[in-house]
A protein has these predicted regions:
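Sec-dependent N-terminal signal peptides of Gram-positive bacterial secreted proteins and lipoproteins
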Residues: 4-25
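A ligand-binding cleft/hinge motif common to bilobed small-molecule-binding domains
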Residues: 25-38, 145-148, 160-171, 227-234, ...
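Ligand-binding clefts/hinges and TM-proximal coupling segments of bilobed small-molecule sensing domains
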Residues: 32-38, 58-95, 201-243
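Extracytoplasmic small-molecule ligand-binding "clamshell" domains
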Residues: 42, 52-80, 92-162, 170, ...
Length: 280
């Protein structure tokens, strides 16, 4: 009997040791350098030929700010709440519809699961359509086509985590801002190059040491690309790194994990979502 008990204890101890080893081996793949590189404002881009819609959207933004609805939606995505899926109707010219252009690869602002859209912007879009008494139609497309589609009359409004930027005003009229954003770096978890950085100046000092032999990733058409390549409107000088654009920030981070690029620059909220998902 003593031998049996001893054997059981040995097996139990081995099991606990194995579990401990598995836990110790579960390391993160990537991390965010939690220092804001930019100071941006998000807004929606309205068809220039619809000034009445612009006024209505601005009134709507003021209302959801004052009644707490905007904060309520943001808390769902930034504080572990339960997101609400949004369904798009089929576009029909005979119906009174609000047609929204977006890029559903920008969690937590817009993303798609199955046939439903989720994200801060998508839940706002549903509220806006209800506020206007219209049926909601969502058109999902590449990010760099979003504002263009509105200017071509293919959509009424762009809702896609859009930073207010001068060259985009050629295509749309921006609403009042509804969210403050910034760019951040995503690097591999074992990357120590930025560990001593405390300020944006510290990060930029490190970035300035990189040459063309260093590859950086970003989502095409976003502020991250402008930050890396340089942009006169923003006052970005850019860096000497080789910039590689992707259709989604998650694709850039995955390519970094695969060893093809060195780091990624992307908006703070999507960066943190991507890192959380990549690390499981």
């Amino acid at each position: 009997m003593k031998k049996i008990i001893s054997l059981v204890l040995v097996v139990a101890l081995l099991s606990l040791t194995l579990l401990a080893c598995v836990s110790c081996g579960a390391t993160d793949a990537v991390k965010v350098i939690d220092i804001a590189l930019t100071d941006e404002k998000y807004a929606f881009g309205v068809d220039k030929n619809q000034p009445e819609l612009l006024a209505q959207v601005n009134a709507f933004i003021a209302e959801i700010k004052s009644n707490g609805k905007l904060d309520e939606i943001c808390e769902k995505y930034f504080q572990g709440g339960e997101p609400t899926g949004v369904t798009s109707a089929t576009e029909d010219a005979s119906k009174d519809q609000l047609v929204v252009a977006t890029n559903a690869q920008f969690e937590p602002f817009e993303y798609k699961l199955g046939d439903k859209y989720y994200g801060v912007d998508m839940e706002i879009a549903k509220l806006l359509a209800d506020y206007l008494g219209k049926e909601l139609v969502i058109k999902n497309m590449d990010f760099d086509a979003v504002c263009l589609s509105v200017s071509q009359g293919k959509a009424d409004i762009a809702m896609a985590g859009l930073t207010i930027k001068e060259d985009r005003k050629e295509f749309v009229t921006f609403t009042d801002s509804y969210y403050n954003a910034s760019q951040m770096l995503v690097v591999k978890a074992d990357d120590t190059r930025f560990d001593d950085c405390k300020t944006v100046a510290d990060i930029e000092a490190v970035l300035k040491t990189f040459g063309k032999d260093v590859k950086a990733g970003c989502q095409i058409g976003t502020t991250g690309q402008f930050y890396l390549e340089g942009d006169a409107d923003w006052g970005f000088d850019g860096y000497a790194v080789e910039t590689k654009g992707y259709k989604a920030g998650s694709l850039a981070v995955q390519d970094m994990i695969n060893g093809n690029i060195s780091f990624v620059v992307i908006d703070e909220a999507p960066a943190k979502c991507i890192v959380r998902e990549m690390n499981g």
